[in-house]
């Protein structure tokens, strides 16, 4: 099914025209929804600290999670105390839930588990991001909130909108769901503060981001503190349950890994030991960091993951920090006046 969807969205398959009436209906629904917030019929909650929303206008992976991790580290380096809120995709969360270090993907979602494992950032997940943001401030006293994948969640007021787009796939056929991959029209890019192009080339007004691979590490938790080595010249099985698995496989080939088999899975898909053991047979299994957080409890000794770090320009850092400081100063003045 996913292969057919990709053909419709990214390869000009004629079935897109049959789905176009549904896309028109989707366009009306999204327009009305935005209008309700713009007219004040539906309320938007303004937080006492700056809110940075990281999202995209397409369905599927574009590099949001590495961008969130990059922002966490950037803000910390410049004296901020950031926290993160997220929906916790695929997890039925009643109310809100704090993401503790070591939390499983089944409890909080794979991306929140990965973000906290990597950064130990204060993080709260919940279906209502406003409730999650309030809990984050009350429990941790953060001074900046990063909202992971909340561009279309208009109930949460935002001060800075950052959209990540896939430099390889772009906006696909440019059509709204379900005929195309767009959650909102391309016009939405004109309304955001920052556009990050994952992989480039960046168009005018965009900032190029590259994902730099780190060292290969064992998935099995009790191996991470010991000595280990990985021979990239040996044949291996590669797997990826992300929005664009092909991108991961292409990156591995470019780095010289010998891929005997590549297996893509649906984004956020859960795994079990038997499934992956049968996939790998006796070969090493190499996966993404996001996949690894779902496999730690049953990982084999020859299962590995490759993490990536986002790289952005100093110009991006300077402009984002300048904008954030402006917002923070205005918020302090406004809320001090209210008190």
UniProtKB/Swiss-Prot annotation:
Which GO MF terms does the UniProt record name?
A: ATP binding; tetraacyldisaccharide 4'-kinase activity
**One Pfam family name from the record?**
LpxK
- Which InterPro entries does the protein's record reference? LpxK (IPR003758), P-loop_NTPase (IPR027417)
Entry protein name: Tetraacyldisaccharide 4'-kinase
The kind of enzyme this is, by top-level EC class, is transferase
Identify the keywords attached in UniProt to this record, alphabetized: ATP-binding, Kinase, Lipid A biosynthesis, Lipid biosynthesis, Lipid metabolism, Nucleotide-binding, Transferase
Which domain of life does the protein's organism represent? Bacteria
Q: What is its EC number?
A: 2.7.1.130
Annotated pathway? Glycolipid biosynthesis; lipid IV(A) biosynthesis; lipid IV(A) from (3R)-3-hydroxytetradecanoyl-[acyl-carrier-protein] and UDP-N-acetyl-alpha-D-glucosamine: step 6/6
Record-level GO cellular component terms: plasma membrane
Question: What role is this protein assigned?
Answer: Transfers the gamma-phosphate of ATP to the 4'-position of a tetraacyldisaccharide 1-phosphate intermediate (termed DS-1-P) to form tetraacyldisaccharide 1,4'-bis-phosphate (lipid IVA).
The question of whether DNA-binding is a record keyword is answered with no
Q: Which GO terms describe its biological process?
A: lipid A biosynthetic process; lipopolysaccharide core region biosynthetic process
Q: Which family does it belong to?
A: Belongs to the LpxK family.
Output the PANTHER family linked to this UniProt entry: TETRAACYLDISACCHARIDE 4'-KINASE (PTHR42724), TETRAACYLDISACCHARIDE 4'-KINASE, MITOCHONDRIAL-RELATED (PTHR42724:SF1)
Where does this protein come from, organism-wise?
Answer: Shewanella baltica (strain OS185)
Reaction(s) catalysed by this chain's protein? a lipid A disaccharide + ATP = a lipid IVA + ADP + H(+)
Q: HAMAP family in the record, alphabetically? A: LpxK
Record: residues binding ATP: 58-65
């Amino acid at each position: 099914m996913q292969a057919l969807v990709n053909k419709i969205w990214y390869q000009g398959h004629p079935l897109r025209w049959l789905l176009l009436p549904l896309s028109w209906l989707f366009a009306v629904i999204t327009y009305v929804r935005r209008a309700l917030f713009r007219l004040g019929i539906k309320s938007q909650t303004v937080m006492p600290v700056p809110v940075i929303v990281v999202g995209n206008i397409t369905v599927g992976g574009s590099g949001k999670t590495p961008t969130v991790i990059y922002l966490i580290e950037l803000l910390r380096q410049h004296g901020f105390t950031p926290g993160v809120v997220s929906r916790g995709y695929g997890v039925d969360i009643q109310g809100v839930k704090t993401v503790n270090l070591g939390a499983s993907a089944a409890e909080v979602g794979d991306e929140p588990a990965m973000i906290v494992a990597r950064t130990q950032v204060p993080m709260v997940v919940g279906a209502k991001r406003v409730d999650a943001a309030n809990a984050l401030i009350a429990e941790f006293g953060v001074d900046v909130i990063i909202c992971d994948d909340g561009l279309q969640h208009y109930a949460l007021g935002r001060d800075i909108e950052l959209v990540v787009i896939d430099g390889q796939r772009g906006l696909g056929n440019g059509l709204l769901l379900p005929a195309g991959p767009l959650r909102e029209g391309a016009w939405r890019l004109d309304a955001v503060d920052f556009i990050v192009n994952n992989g480039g080339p960046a168009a005018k007004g965009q900032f190029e981001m590259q994902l730099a691979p780190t060292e290969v590490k064992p998935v099995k938790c009790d191996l991470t503190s010991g000595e280990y080595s990985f021979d990239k010249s040996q044949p291996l099985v590669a797997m990826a349950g992300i929005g664009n698995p092909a991108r991961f496989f292409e990156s591995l080939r470019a780095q010289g890994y010998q891929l005997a088999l590549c297996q893509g899975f649906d984004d956020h898909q859960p795994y079990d030991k038997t499934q992956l053991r049968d996939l790998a047979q006796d070969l090493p299994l190499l996966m993404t960091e996001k996949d690894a957080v779902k496999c730690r409890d049953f990982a084999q000794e020859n299962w590995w993951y490759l993490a990536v770090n986002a790289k952005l320009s100093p110009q991006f850092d300077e402009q984002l920090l300048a904008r954030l400081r402006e917002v923070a100063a205005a918020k302090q003045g406004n809320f001090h006046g209210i008190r």
